[in-house]
Amino acid sequence: MSAVFIPYREVFMNYAGIKEYDIANGPGIRFSLFVSGCTHHCRGCFNPDTWSFHYGKPFTKETEDYIIRQLGQDCYQGMTLLGGEPMEPVNQKGLLPLVKRFKETYPEKDLWCFSGYLFDKEILGHFAKIMPETMELLKYIDILVDGEFVLAKKDITLLFKGSSNQRTIDVQKSLHAGELLSLIHISEPTRLDVI
């Protein structure tokens, strides 16, 4: 009798890399996961290798277990998802088990996500209507930095974003209110003020 292969996930997702003890992609010390695959192809992208969905390594149960284990360290304020594009449909499906497990295991830690897709127009206005995973994933994301990187609007003085068109959104307050109204002003790398 031959062995039956049972995949870890129904959807295959690659990741480009992991950055531990990251201080550039959200407040405090972060555990950052760079997923592979992005269809935006922004001019001036800092990570063009991640555009390919085949770049990097397969995201496995062992990868997920490692991330969850590492995030148990007290030094981490939270986890950040970026890439690549975490909100690409295949990546949403691949990330959902990880973020659910992360928030169930560490409810006191925050989850940031960077996406070139606009929260109100593309994520809620399109993906949420055709993919049940979108609303489920948003349930666990605390802060979303949205909008494509625009080279002509590049601003190195901005905290946690690359161009002035990008927005920092409190996802949970926005979902609760039913509209985008909870933008966050970042006054210091470790302090967030809701405005």
Residue ranges with predicted function:
Residues 11-15, 29, 47-127, 132, ...:
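Conserved Radical SAM active-site core
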Residues 5-34, 43, 47-54, 180:
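N-terminal [4Fe-4S]-dependent radical SAM core
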Residues 141:
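An anion/phosphate-binding loop that grips the pyrophosphate of nucleotide cofactors and donors
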Residues 184-195:
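Single conserved hydrophobic/aromatic residue that forms the stacking wall/gate
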Residues 144:
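Conserved, mostly hydrophobic/aromatic
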Residues 155-176:
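A short, gly/pro- and small-residue-rich
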Residues 147-157:
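A charged, well-structured terminal subsegment
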